[in-house]
Amino acid sequence: MRAPGERWRPAGAALWLLLLLLLLGATESVRRAQPLRRYTPDWPSLDSRPLPSWFDEAKFGVFIHWGVFSVPAWGSEWFWWNWQGEGRPQYQRFMRDNYPPGSSYADFGPQFTARFFHPEEWADLFQAAGAKYVVLTTKHHEGFTNWPSPVSWNWNSKDVGPHRDLVGELGTALRKRNIRYGLYHSLLEWFHPLYLLDKKNGFKTQYFVGAKTMPELYDLVNSYKPDLIWSDGEWECPDTYWNSTNFLSWLYNDSPVKDEVVVNDRWGQNCSCHHGGYYNCEDKFKPQSLPDHKWEMCTSIDKFSWGYRRDMAMSDVTEESEIISELVQTVSLGGNYLLNIGPTKDGLIVPIFQERLLALGKWLSINGEAIYASKPWRVQWEKNTTSVWYTSKGSAVYAIFLHWPENGVLNLESPITTSTTKIMMLRIQGDLKWSTDPDKGLLISLPQLPPSAVPAEFAWTIKLTGVK
C-alpha cells in the first residue's frame, strides 16, 4: 500500500495501463473466437446465418464422384443398387458375363486401387480449369469411405483398396493452390444393417445415425476442416431422423470451420430448396428467373452418370459450348456452377474429361472478369434472344454473347447509355464503336478479326461502363 499522502508514481500508472490493455486485448480475443451470434438447432435460426462471401465469389467448382463404383464402372455410380437393390436385368446380365458366379459388391473393394492417383496432378488440372473450389465424394450411398473412418471398419480406403487417405491427400494439394475444399457426404447407406433396421422401424429409431452418420460428419469436420459440406442421401427420412439441425448448430457455433463453412440444402425430406446455406434444389437445377436465394447448379460432363463408366459413348459427353453456355447462364442468374467428373478406379481422369475442363479454363482465363465475384445485373438476359446474358461488378456491366452476329453488330436493348458510356471487348485493345437506335437500342460494332485473333471460342464478353 502507499503511505498516507504519497503521490501516485508514473511507473505504477504505466503498469496499470499495461494491465488494462492486456485485459482488453484478451477480451477482444475471446470475442473474436466466438461467433457473432449463437444459432439454435432449428431452421429459422440456422437459415438466418449469412452465407460466407467466398462461395458467391467463387462461381465455379469441380465435383468428383469416386469410389468402389468406379471398379465395375458400368451404368452409373448407382451400380450396386441397380444390380442388387432393384435387380435390373441388364445389370445382372453384366455381372454374369463379366465376373465369376457368386461375386459380391465387396469383391470390388480391393480392386479400387487408386494406384495412379497423384493429388498434385489433379490439383494442377483443377487450377488450370479455373475452379475456385473442389468437392470430393468422401462417401457415396455404397458406404465406402475415402478416408480412414473409425466407424467404417474394413470398408474404407485405408483398410481396403488404395490403403491411402484419399480425402486428406487431395485436400493438402488443393490448399497449396488456394482452392477451397468441399466434402460430399451421403447421409444414407443403401445396405447398412443399422440403416435397414431404422427403415424397418419407420425411422422411429436412430441406430444408424448415432453409430455411423453423425460420427462420420463430426470426424470429417474435425479432421479435414472443409470449406463446404455437400450433403446428399437425405430423401427417405425427415431431418429430425438425421439430427441435421443439431449438427448444423454445432457446425455454425463451435466447429473449427464455423466462420467460413458453407453447406447445401440436402438435410432431410422437404429441406431441398427450402433450408440450408445455399440451394441445389435438384440435380442439374436450372431456374427460369433470378432466384431470391443463393443456389448452385450441379451437373456432369457425362450426361448420364456421375461416376466413371466404361460404357460412356462420345455422344454422352457434354460439348464445350454447352458447358460454357451453362456456366454463363448460371452465373447470370446468381448461381454457382459445379461441374462433375468421374475418375477411374486407378485414379486417372480420362482425357475427354481433362479436355473439357481445360477448354473451360481457357475460356475463363479470358472472360473470368465477367464471372468471378460478379453479381446479377438488373436484367439477366436479353428478352429478344437467349444468346446474350448479363453480369455486373461494381460500375461495370458485362454482356456475354453466345452467338457472333453475322453482320458484326451486337444489338443490346437493355443497357441505357449516358454521356460517359464506354464499351470494350475483353482481351481486345481499345474501345468499340457504338450507336443507339430508338427502336433497336444499343448497336455495338464488333471488331473485324481473323479467326486466329478472336480471343475466345463459344462465347465473348462486352464490358460496358457508364450505362444504366
Swiss-Prot record:
Keywords for this protein: Glycoprotein, Glycosidase, Hydrolase, Lipid metabolism, Lysosome, Phosphoprotein, Signal
InterPro entries the record matches: FUC_metazoa-typ, Fucosidase_C, Glyco_hydro_29, Glyco_hydro_29_CS, Glyco_hydro_b, Glycoside_hydrolase_SF
GO cellular component: lysosome
Catalytic reactions of this protein: an alpha-L-fucoside + H2O = L-fucose + an alcohol; a neolactoside IV(2)-alpha-Fuc-nLc4Cer(d18:1(4E)) + H2O = a neolactoside nLc4Cer(d18:1(4E)) + L-fucose; a neolactoside IV(2)-alpha-Fuc-nLc4Cer(d18:0) + H2O = a neolactoside nLc4Cer(d18:0) + L-fucose
EC number: 3.2.1.51
Residues carrying a glycan: N243, N270, N384
SMART domains: Alpha_L_fucos
Residues with Phosphothreonine modification: T172
Site positions for May be important for catalysis: C298
One Gene Ontology term of the molecular function aspect: alpha-L-fucosidase activity
Classification via PANTHER family: ALPHA-L-FUCOSIDASE, TISSUE ALPHA-L-FUCOSIDASE
Subunit composition and interactions: Homotetramer.
Similarity annotation: Belongs to the glycosyl hydrolase 29 family.
Protein name in the entry: Tissue alpha-L-fucosidase
The species this protein was found in: Macaca fascicularis (Crab-eating macaque)
